[in-house]
């Protein structure tokens, strides 16, 4: 499926429906902030990335890696693609780019969302050939079982298959088991049944941090050959 046929893989800025220009202001700030930085890791995605920056676990685990956080609430894959094409990777040479986006691609099929994520990976590979890409799985959402959970799970299956064997991209299933045996999600983990609480972020961030350290060690010749996390 080409970018012209797939809206999820066509770079598109967010429409400023509220009229305050905040999205574009954040984008310009990210570009400006990156000019004097030498991050080992860059995070890019939606509110799940953005809100991570406000948690103590960010300072504990990711600040020591000189990580940059380019998360914007509400972004879909097409918006991240636009941001990456318009300067957010221009002034830096990270060792790893973490991508967490797709749950906001409303109106797009699982196949289209997968195409958008694959386009992001390809763009990072082209713009930052030295960097590895880590794609986080889309988490379940909603207190009770619902079609969006099923769609996100399908995206995860497709992305995992698409990245299998990719030499510079890795898929991380960071869901520690947010869905309970009765099919519900607790507000202790996701306070609004979408966004993570501090309690919810902890296992996700620790799993991600472990993978990042393994990747960084491997690239420095200090680690054993990396195996992607098991399903």
From Swiss-Prot:
Q: What is its EC number?
A: 3.1.1.47
**Which Pfam families is this protein grouped with?**
Lipase_GDSL_2
User: Residues where Phosphoserine occurs?
Assistant: 2
Q: What does the entry report regarding how activity is regulated? A: Beta subunit (PAFAH1B1) inhibits the acetylhydrolase activity of the alpha1/alpha1 catalytic homodimer.
Leading EC class: hydrolase
Q: Which residues carry this modification: N-acetylserine?
A: 2
Q: Which residues form each disulfide bond in the chain?
A: none
The UniProt GO MF terms for this protein read: 1-alkyl-2-acetylglycerophosphocholine esterase activity; platelet-activating factor acetyltransferase activity; protein heterodimerization activity; protein homodimerization activity
Could you confirm whether the keyword Phosphoprotein appears in this record?
yes
Q: Does the keyword Lipid metabolism apply?
A: yes
In terms of Gene3D superfamilies, this protein maps to:
SGNH hydrolase
What's the miscellaneous note? Originally the subunits of the type I platelet-activating factor (PAF) acetylhydrolase was named alpha (PAFAH1B1), beta (PAFAH1B2) and gamma (PAFAH1B3). Now these subunits have been renamed beta (PAFAH1B1), alpha2 (PAFAH1B2) and alpha1 (PAFAH1B3) respectively.
Question: Subunit notes for this chain?
Answer: Forms a catalytic dimer which is either homodimer (alpha1/alpha1 homodimer) or heterodimer with PAFAH1B2 (alpha1/alpha2 heterodimer). Component of the cytosolic (PAF-AH (I)) heterotetrameric enzyme, which is composed of PAFAH1B1 (beta), PAFAH1B2 (alpha2) and PAFAH1B3 (alpha1) subunits. The catalytic activity of the enzyme resides in the alpha1 (PAFAH1B3) and alpha2 (PAFAH1B2) subunits, whereas the beta subunit (PAFAH1B1) has regulatory activity. Trimer formation is not essential for the catalytic activity. Interacts with VLDLR; this interaction may modulate the Reelin pathway.
Put simply, this protein is called: Platelet-activating factor acetylhydrolase IB subunit alpha1
The organism is: Pongo abelii
Phylogenetic classification of the source organism: Eukaryota, Metazoa, Chordata, Craniata, Vertebrata
Q: Which gene encodes it?
A: PAFAH1B3
């Amino acid at each position: 499926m080409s970018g012209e046929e797939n809206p999820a893989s066509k770079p598109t800025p967010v429409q400023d429906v509220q009229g305050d220009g905040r999205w574009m202001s954040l984008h310009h700030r990210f570009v400006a902030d990156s000019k004097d930085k030498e991050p080992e890791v860059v995070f890019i995605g939606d509110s799940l990335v953005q809100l991570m920056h406000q948690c103590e676990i960010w300072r504990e685990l990711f600040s020591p890696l000189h990580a940059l956080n380019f998360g914007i609430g509400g972004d879909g894959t097409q918006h991240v693609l636009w941001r990456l094409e318009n300067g957010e990777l221009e002034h830096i040479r990270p060792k790893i780019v973490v991508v967490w986006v797709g749950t906001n691609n409303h109106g797009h099929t699982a196949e289209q969302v997968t195409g958008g994520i694959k386009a992001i990976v390809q763009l990072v590979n082209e713009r930052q050939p030295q960097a590895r890409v880590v794609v986080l799985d889309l988490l379940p959402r909603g207190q009770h079982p619902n079609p969006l959970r099923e769609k996100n799970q399908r995206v995860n299956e497709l992305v995992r298959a698409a990245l299998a064997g990719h030499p510079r991209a890795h898929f991380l299933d960071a869901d520690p088991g947010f869905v309970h045996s009765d099919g519900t999600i607790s507000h202790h983990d996701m306070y609004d049944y979408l966004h993570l609480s501090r309690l919810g972020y902890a296992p996700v961030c620790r799993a991600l941090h472990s993978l990042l350290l393994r990747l960084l060690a491997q690239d420095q010749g200090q680690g054993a050959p990396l195996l992607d996390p098991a399903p």
